Amino acid sequence: MPLIGMASPLYGQLEPSSPSESPNPLVDTTVKPGKMLLFDLEARFAKDVAQRGGAAFADWFAEDGVALGNGVAPVVGRVAIVKSATWTPQSYQLTWTPTDGVMGPSGDIGYTWGHFEGHSKDAAGNPVTTSGRYITIWRKQPDGTWKVALDAGANEPAAAGDCCKLPN
């Protein structure tokens, strides 16, 4: 979810607040199977990134995937994303929660969107937090796996207050 905060070298690490935050079809009977699949992909993607950092982030992209971030050129292709996603989970932690997801009628493409929050430290060791919105477009590959076709993020303005945060 996601390419977040790409203006810094720590962009893109995503981790859900909790895998249990995915919709529960036993509680919400309106959740469609396609949405459940997308939320499951998000949870697995986030868990992998939380454990392995930028290497995992890049692994989830399609060969022709695109990462879009604030104020920087698009990063096009998995090879370029691998070269730019060099952070570790120890240097940057980012949590995100998908708010919604929609599977296309063909069942081979869908998107999720939500809110993210990233945590790192500046050169002086002071905590730095970024937050914003993201969208991830997922595409089923010819081998049946799902990969990120496009990931884009937009940071919230520093003085956004509660305008851009999801209610609890």
Where do the PLM segments sit?
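Exposed beta-sheet edge and beta->alpha loop/turn motif
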Residues: 108-142, 157-168
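Short beta-strand edge/turn micro-motifs at domain boundaries
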Residues: 13-18, 22, 131-159
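A solvent-exposed, acidic/Ser-Thr-rich amphipathic alpha-helical stretch
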Residues: 29-39, 48, 54-108, 115, ...
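Short, low-complexity N-terminal intrinsically disordered segments enriched in polar/charged residues
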Residues: 10-63, 160-168
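Bacterial N-terminal signal peptides
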Residues: 1-6
